[in-house]
């Protein structure tokens, strides 16, 4: 009887397919749970994004807004499914899943399957990636456009099949990214740097490839002209896209923010996000990857990573809140560091299976510690760290739980939180009225949010019939006043 080899076992032959599938399901589940439960609320930045979506209309002035593709996608979800915590965050969740798929194919092109799986496992459980992936803010667009740009550029440079499709896709991605502040700078910098490296330059200007860029260039030019026209109609859009007014020239304060964000080991909150955004193990692997990629900087891959890294770091010095713009290069460097660590160990014992097995055990333990540590830090941090928990408004879900869309009542809220309730009135609760000052007399039932409860005078004629609460500090979220004492 012929002895069965390990390579003949079904699970072994399909191990990478099972690994990729498991990772995909793991990340989709993690990002949806994050959107609904951890942190389970809306930051002020997310509420401000809803405000922009509320004021969209299909006139020239109405669509002259930054991050237009995101707002259009959010508006589509509001039209189809109404306004809820999930529909507000749905565009970010979808773009996050699409970004993770793009990163998977990018890493698969650059690394061995084992390195790809381990790197994606770390990425999928990193607090920063999970946080940005569930946050309905501009952060996810920086990750999305970065992942697609690097993927399509890699497919073109590696002469993948259907090269014309990847060129057109790169042109569309580049054009749409111009709706996001500061991406003009990244795109322009990458184009200039591409001409400095012989390999990308060959694919851009050689006679053999010039004609293949005609259609992509036309698409990029057309969308660019449309954005230019919108900027001509709305000077505010132009200044927002350029981003000069948002830069901070207090270099010392900016460097301190970056120190808190990446290096300082004690937890704090910077821009609604718990820092440091990566643990010490990940930073060590990134440092190793940085060193290894510098040794091979002449290669197209290392040149691309370092180019993006330098451009992003130059921007972060003046705008330290733009951490999402550097997250993809950092994860690629982490993969480089992980691959280097494995190669270094296997290089020490090329023919000793026991030593190689021991190294595999140690590396597996490192990955497990990073995955479990990242998951617990994210979940426990946004559930129990007081400074972080207080940054997120969970009142929308609470109000929907305790009312019906056919109810008629007045809702007294602050101007800061008003956008989510205006969206709710527009798409779900058509019978309610949103007010910002307390009425003199009670007409219909009045709901008063926690933020403006002090506006209700003690001599108010209405009767406080009940209070809607949650299980957090300052849990008195809505005060309900009626005209009688039923």
Predicted regions span which residues?
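Transmembrane-lumen/periplasm boundary regions of multi-pass, lipid-linked membrane glycan transferases
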Residues: 38, 42, 49-52, 80, ...
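Membrane-interface transmembrane helices that cradle and orient dolichyl/undecaprenyl
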Residues: 109-113, 149-169, 176-177
